[in-house]
Amino acid sequence: MIEADRLIAASGRDREEVQDRAIRPLRLDEYIGQPVVREQMALFIQAARGRNESLDHTLIFGPPGLGKTTLANIIAQEMGVSVKSTSGPILERPGDLAAMLTNLEPHDVLFIDEIHRLSPVVEEVLYPAMEDFQLDIMIGEGPAARSIKLDLPPFTLVGATTRAGMLTNPLRDRFGIVQRLEFYSDKDLATIVSRSANILGLVIEDQGAYEIARRARGTPRIANRLLRRVRDYAEVRGKGQITKAVADLALNLLDVDERGFDHSDRRLLLTMIEKFDGGPVGVDNLAAAISEERHTIEDVLEPYLIQQGYIMRTPRGRVVTRHAYLHFGLNVPGRLGEGADFSEAGDE
């Protein structure tokens, strides 16, 4: 199974990137949710503009689909400068990074997505650029090689990552501002869905927006994707209006249940319950039982189920919690009662 194949995948798709540009907020006052991040960034941006300086280098991290790219573009808009965008895997050689840095205007924003995937040799070039606004370039080869320094205009590097722990300490320490994006509340997601529907010219009721929001796994990207699919259903079977009933019918047809689980999520949970008595079960045994790769379970299926409290990792393997039994209307085993002891829970 490929993550991008799932309707509820948090990772982006090329076609969606184009579609999302039309509904992406451009200013902080249009940015919904993340109140602490929004207030802090408004303060930092106002201060930097008041001093006529570049904003400090900013690291944005959090799960995929929460708006890291959107926030980077908003920073550039609020600073009144241009943004140049790239990603860690694309910058294969120092020359690739040097070409982008030398084309920046004063105070511009350089946005690097998946910054944790920068190669070490490229990262070394980035250090003096971030710290001293200088670029060290080697001219020539062998004994005749020499290093020259090029001055760069002051700029703001905005790095985005889903895996902040994979950043090297020297790179992490060079960011003056670090922001973590959290999963969104259903209320904020419903506001995002209503806003997107309005931009797309759709008729949507508040309850219809909330029905989509509560199945979107706390992620705006998923909420907007579900909105587009519910729109298709509404146009064909619902007279073009998205009500709670229409959203419910559409999402049930799309196999996204009231908790935002799809077939793959439910199959994993039911396999653990029915074949392994709720666990503990090792991830390799679980992978064999559902015919999936180990990394698919660890990287694609498990994170949301763990975050929602349906699965726990213990020293002896994975176990389902009482919430999984309740979700399927099954009797909760006595060992998983209200006073169940998970004191030994941890990473397998």
Swiss-Prot record:
<dbReference type="InterPro" id="IPR008824">
    <property type="entry name" value="RuvB-like_N"/>
</dbReference>
<dbReference type="InterPro" id="IPR041445">
    <property type="entry name" value="AAA_lid_4"/>
</dbReference>
<dbReference type="InterPro" id="IPR036388">
    <property type="entry name" value="WH-like_DNA-bd_sf"/>
</dbReference>
<feature type="binding site">
    <location>
        <position position="294"/>
    </location>
    <ligand>
        <name>DNA</name>
    </ligand>
</feature>
<feature type="binding site">
    <location>
        <position position="65"/>
    </location>
    <ligand>
        <name>ATP</name>
    </ligand>
</feature>
<dbReference type="GO" id="GO:0016887">
    <property type="term" value="F:ATP hydrolysis activity"/>
</dbReference>
<feature type="binding site">
    <location>
        <position position="313"/>
    </location>
    <ligand>
        <name>DNA</name>
    </ligand>
</feature>
<dbReference type="InterPro" id="IPR003593">
    <property type="entry name" value="AAA+_ATPase"/>
</dbReference>
<dbReference type="GO" id="GO:0048476">
    <property type="term" value="C:Holliday junction resolvase complex"/>
</dbReference>
<comment type="subunit">
    <text>Homohexamer. Forms an RuvA(8)-RuvB(12)-Holliday junction (HJ) complex. HJ DNA is sandwiched between 2 RuvA tetramers; dsDNA enters through RuvA and exits via RuvB. An RuvB hexamer assembles on each DNA strand where it exits the tetramer. Each RuvB hexamer is contacted by two RuvA subunits (via domain III) on 2 adjacent RuvB subunits; this complex drives branch migration. In the full resolvosome a probable DNA-RuvA(4)-RuvB(12)-RuvC(2) complex forms which resolves the HJ.</text>
</comment>
<feature type="region of interest" description="Large ATPase domain (RuvB-L)">
    <location>
        <begin position="4"/>
        <end position="184"/>
    </location>
</feature>
<keyword id="KW-0963">Cytoplasm</keyword>
<keyword id="KW-0378">Hydrolase</keyword>
<keyword id="KW-0234">DNA repair</keyword>
<dbReference type="GO" id="GO:0000400">
    <property type="term" value="F:four-way junction DNA binding"/>
</dbReference>
<dbReference type="GO" id="GO:0009378">
    <property type="term" value="F:four-way junction helicase activity"/>
</dbReference>
<dbReference type="GO" id="GO:0005737">
    <property type="term" value="C:cytoplasm"/>
</dbReference>
<dbReference type="GO" id="GO:0005524">
    <property type="term" value="F:ATP binding"/>
</dbReference>
<feature type="binding site">
    <location>
        <position position="318"/>
    </location>
    <ligand>
        <name>DNA</name>
    </ligand>
</feature>
<keyword id="KW-0067">ATP-binding</keyword>
<feature type="binding site">
    <location>
        <position position="68"/>
    </location>
    <ligand>
        <name>ATP</name>
    </ligand>
</feature>
<keyword id="KW-0238">DNA-binding</keyword>
<keyword id="KW-0547">Nucleotide-binding</keyword>
<feature type="region of interest" description="Head domain (RuvB-H)">
    <location>
        <begin position="258"/>
        <end position="348"/>
    </location>
</feature>
<comment type="similarity">
    <text>Belongs to the RuvB family.</text>
</comment>
<feature type="binding site">
    <location>
        <position position="221"/>
    </location>
    <ligand>
        <name>ATP</name>
    </ligand>
</feature>
<dbReference type="Pfam" id="PF05496">
    <property type="entry name" value="RuvB_N"/>
</dbReference>
<keyword id="KW-0227">DNA damage</keyword>
<dbReference type="GO" id="GO:0006281">
    <property type="term" value="P:DNA repair"/>
</dbReference>
<feature type="region of interest" description="Small ATPAse domain (RuvB-S)">
    <location>
        <begin position="185"/>
        <end position="255"/>
    </location>
</feature>
<protein>
    <recommendedName>
        <fullName>Holliday junction branch migration complex subunit RuvB</fullName>
        <ecNumber>3.6.4.-</ecNumber>
    </recommendedName>
</protein>
<dbReference type="InterPro" id="IPR008823">
    <property type="entry name" value="RuvB_C"/>
</dbReference>
<dbReference type="InterPro" id="IPR036390">
    <property type="entry name" value="WH_DNA-bd_sf"/>
</dbReference>
<feature type="binding site">
    <location>
        <position position="69"/>
    </location>
    <ligand>
        <name>Mg(2+)</name>
    </ligand>
</feature>
<dbReference type="GO" id="GO:0006310">
    <property type="term" value="P:DNA recombination"/>
</dbReference>
<comment type="function">
    <text>The RuvA-RuvB-RuvC complex processes Holliday junction (HJ) DNA during genetic recombination and DNA repair, while the RuvA-RuvB complex plays an important role in the rescue of blocked DNA replication forks via replication fork reversal (RFR). RuvA specifically binds to HJ cruciform DNA, conferring on it an open structure. The RuvB hexamer acts as an ATP-dependent pump, pulling dsDNA into and through the RuvAB complex. RuvB forms 2 homohexamers on either side of HJ DNA bound by 1 or 2 RuvA tetramers; 4 subunits per hexamer contact DNA at a time.</text>
</comment>
<feature type="binding site">
    <location>
        <position position="24"/>
    </location>
    <ligand>
        <name>ATP</name>
    </ligand>
</feature>
<dbReference type="Pfam" id="PF17864">
    <property type="entry name" value="AAA_lid_4"/>
</dbReference>
<keyword id="KW-0233">DNA recombination</keyword>
<feature type="binding site">
    <location>
        <begin position="131"/>
        <end position="133"/>
    </location>
    <ligand>
        <name>ATP</name>
    </ligand>
</feature>
<dbReference type="Pfam" id="PF05491">
    <property type="entry name" value="RuvB_C"/>
</dbReference>
<feature type="binding site">
    <location>
        <position position="174"/>
    </location>
    <ligand>
        <name>ATP</name>
    </ligand>
</feature>
